[in-house]
Amino acid sequence: MLNKFFKTIHNKYSRFFKFIFFLRYLFAIFFVSISLFLIIPGFFNYEKKEKLIKNYFLESYNLKISEYENIKYKAFPIPRLEFKKTRINFLKSNANFNVNYLQVYPKIFSIYNLNNFEASKIILKENDVNLKTSNFYTFINEISKLRKKIFFNDLNIKIINDDKLVVKLE
């Protein structure tokens, strides 16, 4: 009796169980391929491609990266490039940024193709900015006119006039 009951259940739902077991393998393949797609760029040498990234900053944001300590790629939770201890110059306003952490979030397909590099957003963390009083207005205008996303975390602004500190905003 028990054997008959087991056979009827097995025969009745066998197509459903086969489909569920097939989905299990399909999800495993999908998960492995996505994780490999995100992890493999961590082995690339971004020091060789620095000119392409610097050129993108210059064209899109009017930012000139003059110095940095190193570039690292981090895949999780969101793929990003991290520059440490970076010195950046705003070209039109002559503002000098000293940034401890510059995070660039590239678009998904521009992780592999750095010739057509595009970033979805940029985060500047722990910034020190030195501005002259004459360049303050142009600096504010340039930041407000940017079409691409740029975020500042922990921004310290020093406004200087004739080598004297006028205002320090933290």
Where are these regions (language model features)?
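Flexible beta-edge/linker motif
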Residues: 42-51, 56, 69-165
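A short, amphipathic edge element
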Residues: 62-70
